[in-house]
């Protein structure tokens, strides 16, 4: 080939990471294809979350929003930057292991798949995503629906993958009530502003507390009228929900404290510094900042 031919090759399109034999050279040959498929679908989910946050858009190429404090975001929306697939209006995405919110990450991933590939093949595509994730990212679970598998990936594995992808400097931050996972949500650091925590409380945490309480009351009534194995199952469900309720109440107290402080972040300080400003409201603080959470 001559020089002009070489000049026509856009080097950014050449990547050994798309070659499973190179990318997974330390793995057994028979596992490489499945690993590539699983990783590719994990990356698709990450991209769809980027579209949900407004970082990316189906209507524009490249990085669409990466300013500070949500500034200029409303203008982008007004000029139609997110027409095909609307970005989330507050940059707070509930990441729940059950269906407590209509607009949680799992339902928005489903909406994204529907928008891009159409209603006709929606179930087929969800099945393919779920099967692909089970090739490596998570273990298969018998009798689980495709959407439940995707939800399980999102609530148990997505954050670990995101931390790895961004080398412990995440751009989507995981707010977490604790080990019971009573409430978790992702916040896009470029859209975070000093009103984000107050909104997280009023729009998500406080309504969820009421929902938990209503469900506990309902289960208490059902326990009274049940016996044997059914009563045992209902009690187990109630006790699990009570643990979540107590964890969430404690999280809400701490969240209110930090929301009242109206904390700002300065992107120039970097993720490591900014991530440490929220005490133990965020997950994996020590892994990111190098220090245990500092409670203010």
Residue spans of the language-model regions?
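Terminal accessory regions of large proteins
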Residues: 3-296
